[in-house]
Swiss-Prot record:
Stretches for region Disordered: 39-60
Protein name: Small ribosomal subunit protein bS21
Key words, A-Z: Ribonucleoprotein, Ribosomal protein
Gene Ontology biological process terms, A to Z: translation
Highest taxon above the source species: Bacteria
Family under the similarity heading: Belongs to the bacterial ribosomal protein bS21 family.
One Gene Ontology cellular component: ribonucleoprotein complex
Transmembrane segments: none
InterPro entries: Ribosomal_bS21, Ribosomal_bS21_CS, Ribosomal_bS21_sf
Record's compositionally biased regions (Basic residues): 44-60
Gene Ontology MF annotations: structural constituent of ribosome
Amino acid sequence: MTQVVVGQNEAIESALRRFKRQVAKAGIYADIKKHQFFETPQEKRKRKAVARRRQRTRRR
């Protein structure tokens, strides 16, 4: 859970910016995007196979 404590003299905009930065760093946006639609087991296997292939080519 991401939390931002707003200081007494702190602007809401700066606190919002800090919150967005923490959410992006924690990977919450990517997780929400990944779980937005149902992924069939076949699609999941295909996505993981592509990721493995990509990793193999990066190592070389």
